[in-house]
């Protein structure tokens, strides 16, 4: 599939997604497979979780539009999935959802080394992140934080 047809297919699928308050966050076309595999990752525009029903409700109109477009002149498999949960916490929703969960916090040190703190996510404000490390709350200014990730708690 050439770039022009891939762009047309992507625009077509985005239109179908937008009509259902969804957005495409990933599109992978595996033309080396027989049949061709089209993997589409979707999420809801309002941030709600994607259900299996949402994937199924997107599948039929997406498939219909692909057929009508004649962009593919071969058989294909359409796979619709949700974005899933990322290990890295970035959105306000992530911080609310995973409050109390174990996290690794990567800190930027003045000597350009990275320090990792491990604890339970306690609180996030606009200025700092608070984690519970063995019963003590540590407030970390956001300008020191490089990355916050879910993890398994270490002793």
Swiss-Prot record:
GO cellular component term of the entry, any: cytosol
Compartments where found: Cytoplasm
InterPro entries: Ribosome_maturation_RimP, RimP_C_sf, RimP_N, RimP_N_sf
Chief location bin: cytoplasm
GO biological process, one term: ribosomal small subunit assembly
Cystines in this chain: none
Family of the protein in this entry: Belongs to the RimP family.
Function field: Required for maturation of 30S ribosomal subunits.
Name of the protein described by the UniProt record: Ribosome maturation factor RimP
Gene that this polypeptide is encoded by: rimP
């Amino acid at each position: 599939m050439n770039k022009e047809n891939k762009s047309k297919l992507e625009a077509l699928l985005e239109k179908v997604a937008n009509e259902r308050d969804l957005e495409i966050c990933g599109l992978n076309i595996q033309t080396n497979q027989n049949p061709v595999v089209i993997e589409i990752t979707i999420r809801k525009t309002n941030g709600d979780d994607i259900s299996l029903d949402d994937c199924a409700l997107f599948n039929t109109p997406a498939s219909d539009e692909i057929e009508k477009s004649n962009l593919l002149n071969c058989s294909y498999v359409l796979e619709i999935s949700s974005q899933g949960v990322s290990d890295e916490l970035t959105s306000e929703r992530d911080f609310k959802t995973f409050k109390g969960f174990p996290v690794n916090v990567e800190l930027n040190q003045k000597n350009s080394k990275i320090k990792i703190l491990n604890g339970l996510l306690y609180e996030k404000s606009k200025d700092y992140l608070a984690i519970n490390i063995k019963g003590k709350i540590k407030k970390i200014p956001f300008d020191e934080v490089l990355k916050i990730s879910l993890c398994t708690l270490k002793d």
